[in-house]
Amino acid sequence: MSANQSQSISGALSQLTSSNSFYGGNVDILSSLLQFNLMWASVFLLAIHLLVNTLVYYIPFVGRLPMVGTINNLIWFVATLLLIILVYVASDNIIVKAFGGILVLLLLLSVIILLYKSTMFFITLYYHQSFMVAARGPTVLSVNGSHYSLDFIPSAVIITTRQGKCFYNGHDLGSCSADSCSVILFSGRYRSEFEVHRNSPKKLTVDVCGYTTLLTVYTPKASKTDV
């Protein structure tokens, strides 16, 4: 092999090495940009999640808007997923990997909650054919057409009057008579409807989820009945 040939081979190898280092540098830059974008996207979504929770806590009206809870859970799910991807892409540290495992558990919990809420939404929508009920379900109380989401079946429904208006649990029902209100209780696929007036029994038997439940309905002037 001549000296010229060996010089040309070494030159080609040096060019190949510099080319590989150039592309390797580009890959490192793209990887860093990806990690940076993942981090800020997850931080942004978590900030929205915390903001929604704060608004629901201090402004209860926000929590009664349709699909707020489901959308907030979806935001938490996506933010957690992005954090998991970021942790497993960015680090080989075992401690960081363990932190990623905790995030995986949180993600699975979010998936379970999201699947449960979505399933109950479609079940309620199928049985009651009402988007308003399904969005606030699965347990919903309707008083004169106004729907209220409940965490559990109430033992009493208290309807008060003030300055010619009716109120249920602080919610304005408008101008109506507290002696005659239409109350509907939705729970899953069950629906119980009854009228509230002076001569109606104050203790009502309601069929909810296949079980007989006693529900007390009264106005301020009526004597309270223990359940």
Curated annotation (Swiss-Prot):
Parts of the chain on the Virion surface side:
1-42, 88-95
Q: Does the keyword Transmembrane helix apply?
A: yes
Per the record, its GO cellular-component terms are: host cell Golgi membrane; membrane; viral envelope; virion membrane
Q: Which residues lie on this side of the membrane: Intravirion?
A: 64-66, 117-227
Q: Does the keyword Repeat apply?
A: no
Lipid bilayer topology: Multi-pass membrane protein
Cellular location(s): Virion membrane; Host Golgi apparatus membrane
Superkingdom in the source lineage? Viruses
Q: Disulfide connectivity?
A: none
- For this UniProt record, give its keywords in alphabetical order, as a comma-separated list: Glycoprotein, Host Golgi apparatus, Host membrane, Membrane, Transmembrane, Transmembrane helix, Viral envelope protein, Viral matrix protein, Virion
Residues modified by carbohydrate are 4
Segments passing through the bilayer: 43-63, 67-87, 96-116
The protein's role, per its UniProt record: Component of the viral envelope that plays a central role in virus morphogenesis and assembly via its interactions with other viral proteins.
Membership in a protein family: Belongs to the torovirinae M protein family.
Q: How does it assemble?
A: Interacts with many viral proteins in infected cells. Interacts with envelope E protein in the budding compartment of the host cell, which is located between endoplasmic reticulum and the Golgi complex. Forms a complex with HE and S proteins. Interacts with nucleocapsid N protein. This interaction probably participates in the viral mRNA packaging into the virus.
This chain's protein is named Membrane protein
